[in-house]
Regions:
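Sigma70-family region 2
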Residues: 18-19, 56-73, 92-93
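C-terminal edge and immediately downstream basic/flexible tail or linker adjoining helix-turn-helix-like DNA-binding
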Residues: 2-5, 16, 174-195
């Protein structure tokens, strides 16, 4: 799918939603709720908190949508909104003062059923070990790169990095993992992330 055409499509849906089209709101919800859950579940393991945060995202959109500025990227807007709501809820619940404290354990484990038959248990353990060595921001970066349609600029805004730094980090991460794991294992892993 052409990313530009997809963004254009969602901008049209957003325009229709702002004009009062409830089907457009439902389309936004249906398209993005699973992606938000997947992203949010890597930020927090508190399922009830995550479900409340996702609900708040859509309540806010529904309540304020007609007066909100049209986002350049709806997916970026939703991810950023969810992340902010989760931070706020975690801060209230645990009295965190800095978002970095909450993101120490961004979870980059995936259901690897698709590749388990293709690689050995040893390779799978090595892959998970290598992923666990990454800091939270790098794990989040890999997740966003392969599980979202965000541009490098949008990923950078979400992670407080400039786009060039994002590009370089993705390249370095993949080069490093490829060097440690080999092309075959890494390619299977990356394929599993996209599904």
């Amino acid at each position: 799918v052409d990313p530009f055409a997809e963004r254009e499509y969602w901008q049209i849906i957003w325009d229709n939603f702002q004009k009062g089209d409830r089907d457009a709101f439902q389309a936004i919800y249906d398209e993005f709720v699973d992606a938000l859950f997947s992203y949010g579940s890597r930020i927090t393991s508190h399922r009830a908190l995550l479900e409340d945060a996702i609900q708040d995202v859509f309540i806010d959109i529904y309540s304020y949508g007609p007066v909100l500025r049209k986002p350049e990227s709806l997916e970026y807007y939703l991810f950023k909104t969810l992340k902010n709501i989760i931070y706020r809820k975690l801060k209230e619940k645990h009295r965190f003062t800095h978002p970095e404290e909450m993101m120490e354990h961004f979870d980059l484990t995936f259901p690897l059923e698709e590749i388990e038959e293709e690689i050995s248990d040893e390779q799978l353990k090595q892959l998970q070990t290598e992923l666990n060595k990454l800091d939270s921001k790098k794990r989040e970066l890999l997740f966003l790169k392969f599980n979202s349609g965000l541009t490098y600029r949008e990923m950078g805004k979400l992670l407080n990095l400039n786009p060039e730094a994002v590009k370089k980090q993705v390249y370095r991460l993949l080069t490093n993992l490829r060097g440690k794991m080999g092309n075959g294992t890494l390619n299977l892993f990356l394929f599993s992330m996209k599904n």
